[in-house]
């Protein structure tokens, strides 16, 4: 027996329960703000670990990408087939200011457009907007039967597919290079670019259901807080204006009435 060792002293059990700490007690909620391009500005909340020492909570928020349905951002169920990606660029108080980071069409929508005996035509183009965003636009379209066509199939020749590819790329390049990112998003949401492609390709072969199925942000310009605040409508021009309320003819000044009565 070793000197100083007492067998009678009870030891702690190995399987003792540890103190349970709620993981959410170390986290806090931040509000997500969408740009003014969308109707719904507050589109959700996100969790982040609280600031501890030199590790700031804002560092864990910047760069986060959130994917939302366009139906929720615009309060329109008809736009549920399109998804929007928004990335957190800056944090103001408890609000995360986001910016456009891409868009895509749901698989259900693409599968619903595919038809038997019709040709599917795809194209993509790398473009640069006026405000310095490098984007890659993906377009998809389907052939359409000519008026009075008797043939059951509606396939297009490879030579015409090449011409349609060129038209798709040229239209997407012109629309994107002559507009800012905000203006481009406004064009993509109502599918105006797809309608322009249908008009341009009408002389080659009639198309239908042409849409920009995906936009990928390849490179963003240098971060500018002023432009971000403008996209969230924080400019000084939007301050409240004074309202002139016309006073009723029957209204009287109480002090004047008391002086007249005395």
From Swiss-Prot:
The keyword Heme does not apply. Its main location: cytoplasm. It is found in: Cytoplasm. GO terms for cellular component: cytosolic small ribosomal subunit. Pfam families: Ribosomal_S3Ae. SMART domains: Ribosomal_S3Ae. Keywords: Cytoplasm, Ribonucleoprotein, Ribosomal protein. GO terms for molecular function: structural constituent of ribosome. The keyword Ribosomal protein applies. It comes from the Eukaryota. GO terms for biological process: translation. Belongs to the eukaryotic ribosomal protein eS1 family. Component of the small ribosomal subunit. Mature ribosomes consist of a small (40S) and a large (60S) subunit. The 40S subunit contains about 33 different proteins and 1 molecule of RNA (18S). The 60S subunit contains about 49 different proteins and 3 molecules of RNA (25S, 5.8S and 5S). This is Small ribosomal subunit protein eS1. It comes from Theileria parva.
């Amino acid at each position: 027996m070793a000197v100083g060792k007492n067998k009678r002293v009870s030891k702690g059990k190995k399987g003792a329960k540890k103190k349970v700490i709620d993981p959410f007690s170390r986290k806090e909620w931040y509000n997500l703000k969408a740009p003014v391009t969308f109707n719904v500005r507050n589109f959700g909340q996100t969790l982040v670990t609280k600031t501890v020492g030199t590790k700031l909570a804002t560092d864990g928020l910047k760069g986060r990408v959130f994917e939302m349905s366009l139906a929720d951002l615009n309060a329109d169920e008809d736009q549920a087939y399109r998804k929007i990606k928004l990335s957190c660029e800056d944090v103001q108080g408890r609000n995360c200011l986001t910016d456009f980071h891409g868009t895509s069409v749901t698989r259900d929508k693409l599968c619903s457009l595919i038809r038997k005996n019709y040709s599917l035509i795809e194209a993509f183009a790398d473009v640069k907007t006026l405000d310095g965003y490098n984007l890659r636009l993906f377009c998809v379209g389907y052939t359409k039967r000519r008026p009075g066509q008797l043939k059951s199939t509606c396939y297009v020749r490879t030579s015409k597919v090449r011409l349609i590819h060129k038209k798709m790329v040229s239209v997407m390049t012109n629309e994107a290079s002559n507009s800012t990112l905000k203006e481009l998003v406004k064009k993509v949401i109502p599918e105006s670019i797809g309608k322009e492609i249908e008009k341009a390709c009408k002389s080659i072969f009639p198309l239908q259901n042409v849409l920009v199925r995906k936009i990928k942000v390849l490179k963003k310009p240098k971060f500018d807080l002023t432009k971000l605040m403008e996209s969230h409508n924080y400019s000084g021009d939007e301050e409240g204006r004074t309202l002139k309320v016309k006073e009723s003819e029957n209204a009287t000044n109480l002090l004047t009435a008391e002086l007249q009565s005395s």
